[in-house]
Amino acid sequence: MLTRRRFLGYSALSPALLASRPLLRSGFAMPPASSSQAPLRIAIIGSVYHLGSNLQSIADRFLVGYPYAGNWHMPNVQVVSLYVDSLAPKFAGPIAWGRRLEAARHPQGKRNSGQGPATQPIELGPPHPPIAQSVRRRPGALGLGIQLPEKFGPMTDLSGVRSREFGFRLCRNIPEALRAGGERLAVDAVIVVAEQGDYPTNSKGQALLPSYDFFQQCVQVFEEERRGVPYFNYKQLSFSFPEAQQMVNTAERLHFPLLAGSSFPVASRLPDVDIPRGTHVEEAVMVGAGGFDGSDFDALEAMQSMLERRKGGETGVKAVQLLEGDDVWQAGREGRYSRELLSSALSRSDTPMGLTLLDGRNQDLVASGVLPQLVKNPAAYCIEYADSTRATLLMLNGAIMDFNISARVAGKELVSTQFFIPPTPNETNTACLADKIEQTFMTRKTPYPVERTLLTSGMLEACLESRHRLNQRVETPQLGVKYQPPAESQYTRT
């Protein structure tokens, strides 16, 4: 359906293309494989490029390389263009997408808001990004000079700094980024990180991130060129499951690889274990920390990356319920989730709080009964799978600060591990993800199915719908997503 925000989002594209009928699937050509010698040309599209932002964490891996398997790895790629949505109001031409204009309709306001209101009108600027700034030379650790803005801090935009250092083009809209300033598709792959930034939220508390809008604009260029390129979308496909489903269907129809998701499923694990493929899983409990519509997606997808390996593969989710407050503890007393699995998952944590912080003693947070004292606002994401497998994600802010899981596998002992997520700025988990992105770009094959991220996107949306309905159980017939996991585990082992 063509809505006002969709029309505004596509206004940067050619009128002739918008008026044309969809191209036939059979006429969509596969591009020739890139030479192993020539670097792949990459366009990067994102929301904000600040120090510590998700975009910086991913994009910098393809500019300076990353540690992997005991070595420093430099991808055989060349970043040729960058579009940053937070800079769009400073640039000439129409805004690249229209969802920001709907902020007034959502009384919940904005997540990670900036200086101005989301409905701030776009002012036309000069024909090219104003990236020239007053800079000073600051010595690096090895005496190397690095150009940094005069006023450098956590919220300083890095687009201009990186553009000058690495020589790529800053673009005013997404089609320009894919064409690298020319008239034809000029990149071999696309990286999209539509996270954080100044976006409105809806009544469920979901940030209206523009992942789908960015994707649609890229697809318009692909269709005009009658060829697509590998595409990576960081974290959830969309806040809307129908939009996420359409993204997957479009990639399949147009024959280009679509990889998506969080770094958690591919991060190292402590210990190095996985659920044996094809075994029966009775129940799983995941524990973590964070907020709604944030790190809960990371945790849900990490949990899904293990549970999809159960007998029969993934068959979908039939219902969800998000519990809060005392209802979380009551659910444990009633057996809605296993306290044994909860204790097992917590035993993998390296960040226990409570008495451990006060006097160094270890304690069983479950048996001692201190969890309700430590966790003031608990949340439980209860997932009922179509094959009767049960899973619960417990967000326990105040008790732990890492992410751990325990699962009961039929005929075996409990399988438990920690998803190892180092603190910033190292975040080697994103290096693990960068390796999977690079693998997809080089081979034009995804190492794991995008349906994992599709299902997780739908689970999160349904859980937030449950919360919106005062924590009622919500049936999810739309989440009958079926797929088979990869034959080999894809998390990092070296």
Predicted regions and their residues:
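N-terminal secretory signal peptides and thylakoid transit peptides that target proteins
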Residues: M1-P15
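N-terminal Rossmann-like dinucleotide-binding module
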Residues: A29-P107, E123-S163, A284
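NAD(P)-dependent dehydrogenases' Rossmann-like dinucleotide-binding region
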Residues: I42, P257-R269, R277-F292, E314-D326, ...
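A structured beta-alpha segment of the ubiquitous adenosine-cofactor-binding alpha/beta core
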Residues: V161-A189, V193-Y199, F214
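Beta-strand-loop-alpha-helix segment that lines the small-molecule cofactor/substrate pocket
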Residues: E195-P265
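Contiguous beta-strand/loop segments that form the cofactor/metal-binding neighborhood of enzyme cores
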Residues: G288, D298-T424, A431-E451, L460-C463, ...
